[in-house]
């Protein structure tokens, strides 16, 4: 794809179900990877180190957003069903 400046745009990476599952499993245990581990995962999943790095960056942002939203749903003090504090 070419953008307005005539530059070729890089295509969006599509991950297979297997790759996504393996990346999610790794993320569950480690939100941050060492370079050595990133190389191992890239090799095992036939992806580049850069793809692994960016996937983890994006996943951390998603995790942060999810936890931020979850904490906003917690009421700081007990509310009665009528909207007044007890």
Curated annotation (Swiss-Prot):
Could you list this entry's UniProt keywords, alphabetically sorted: Developmental protein, DNA-binding, Homeobox, Nucleus
Feature: DNA-binding region: 8-67
Q: Single GO molecular-function term?
A: DNA-binding transcription factor activity, RNA polymerase II-specific
Q: What is its main location?
A: nucleus
Query: Does Ribosomal protein appear among the keywords?
Result: no
Read off the InterPro entries from this record.
Answer: Antp_homeobox_Deformed_sf (IPR050609), HD (IPR001356), HD_metazoa (IPR020479), Homeobox_CS (IPR017970), Homeodomain-like_sf (IPR009057)
Q: Which domain of life is it from?
A: Eukaryota
UniProt family annotation:
Belongs to the Antp homeobox family. Deformed subfamily.
Q: Name one GO cellular component term.
A: nucleoplasm
PROSITE patterns recorded for this chain?
Answer: HOMEOBOX_1, HOMEOBOX_2
Source organism = Apis mellifera (Honeybee)
A GO biological process of this protein is: positive regulation of transcription by RNA polymerase II
| Intracellular or extracellular location(s) | Nucleus
Protein name, as recorded:
Homeobox protein H55
Biological function: Sequence-specific transcription factor which is part of a developmental regulatory system that provides cells with specific positional identities on the anterior-posterior axis.
